[in-house]
Amino acid sequence: MAKKIITVNVNGKAQEKAVEPRTLLIHFLREELNLTGAHIGCETSHCGACTVDIDGRSVKSCTHLAVQCDGSEVLTVEGLANKGVLHAVREGFYKEHGLQCGFCTPGMLMRAYRFLQENPNPTEAEIRMGMTGNLCRCTGYQNIVKAVQYAARKLQEPSTAAA
């Protein structure tokens, strides 16, 4: 199959690569760009471990083709750090123990990031609803909710609002 040249901005860096049209975004990120934060879990868009942000939307990269991202802005979990400083969402998961085995964490972080862009001051119920597309088999979700609440508070602080 003939490869197609795509140009995509990933974590603020322009990338131009030749990909087969059937290449899934998750494989493009992991194998072509060596960005292995997003995980391959179910490969059916059910678990959310592969969640990334594309043009301001949470997307499950296991069922999204790389060619669909031509001209897009993609943010992965690796992009949630600025010069070694953790984004408030990552800090929240760390401080509130929002993970155990860590397999779901990259997708949870990315969904929480987008969710807080959409709803900067959520209630607990809104957090639970907003995170429903991401599954965790370990934590029982309580600390994940606390982590998102922590991040929401942190993002309201003037010094971290731009983080």
Curated annotation (Swiss-Prot):
Necessary cofactors: [2Fe-2S] cluster
EC class (word): oxidoreductase
UniProt: [2Fe-2S] cluster 2 binding residues: 101, 104, 136, 138
InterPro entries hit by this protein: 2Fe-2S-bd, 2Fe-2S-bd_dom_sf, 2Fe-2S_ferredoxin-like_sf, 2Fe-2S_ferredoxin-type, Beta-grasp_dom_sf, Diverse_Oxidoreductases
Superkingdom as given in the UniProt entry: Bacteria
Binding, [2Fe-2S] cluster 1: 42, 47, 50, 62
Alphabetically ordered keywords of this record: 2Fe-2S, Iron, Iron-sulfur, Metal-binding, Oxidoreductase
GO molecular function: 2 iron, 2 sulfur cluster binding; carbon-monoxide oxygenase activity; metal ion binding
Cofactor mode of binding and number, as noted: Binds 2 [2Fe-2S] clusters.
The keyword Iron-sulfur appears for this protein: yes
A Pfam family recorded for this sequence: Fer2
Domain 2Fe-2S ferredoxin-type: 4-80
Gene3D superfamilies xref list: 3.10.20.30, [2Fe-2S]-binding domain
E.C. number: 1.2.5.3
Keyword hit for Aminoacyl-tRNA synthetase: no
Catalysed reactions listed for this entry: CO + a quinone + H2O = a quinol + CO2
Protein purpose: Catalyzes the oxidation of carbon monoxide to carbon dioxide.
Binding partners and assembly: Dimer of heterotrimers. Each heterotrimer consists of a large, a medium and a small subunit.
Name of the protein this chain belongs to: Carbon monoxide dehydrogenase small chain
Annotated organism of origin: Hydrogenophaga pseudoflava
Source organism phylogeny: Bacteria, Pseudomonadati, Pseudomonadota, Betaproteobacteria, Burkholderiales
Gene that encodes the chain: cutS
